[in-house]
Amino acid sequence: INTVVTTDAPLGVHLSAGDSGTSWGTLDRPDALLRAGERLKSAGATAIAVVARFPDDQESEALAAYRHGRGVDALAGAEAVISHLLVRHLRIPCAHAPALEALPPDTELDPRAAGEELGYTFLACVLVGLSRAPDLLDLSSGCSIACTDLIADQLGAVVVPDGALGGEAVLASLERGVPVIA
């Protein structure tokens, strides 16, 4: 980690859920996020880990269901908005860790949610993932492709978790006729 930047304004994260049960979110100030990302890239960042304050709603039914293995992550949609916005704008890998108040201990906690109960953010997980993130290639700029690079034309199929079919990479694969296995 070579540079830490704070946004010049609160992002104003809002969480929502669609009728299908998928989570999504919006930002009041995406411009503040993009300016902070630009400062990091100018300082030499090759990947960005974002920690943003998220709304706390410890009494929500969605949170209780998720903690007990019966629901979707209500934060994931807004996290994706943050990460995808920066990746699309800066063309470098980015991942997000929400900052939340600690939740009270739950003896019925589902093991799949246990890792998310260990701290106020999930930054350690994000940093491990980003340390293994691939470089993004802009083929329209005429960059050279190494024999170890993976590009869309080389994909025979894409395997994704059931219910995770709305992401940009999956939709782009479908547009190219690449089979998607869920």
Where are these regions (language model features)?
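Anaerobic metallocofactor- and corrinoid-dependent redox/one-carbon enzyme cores
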Residues: 1-182
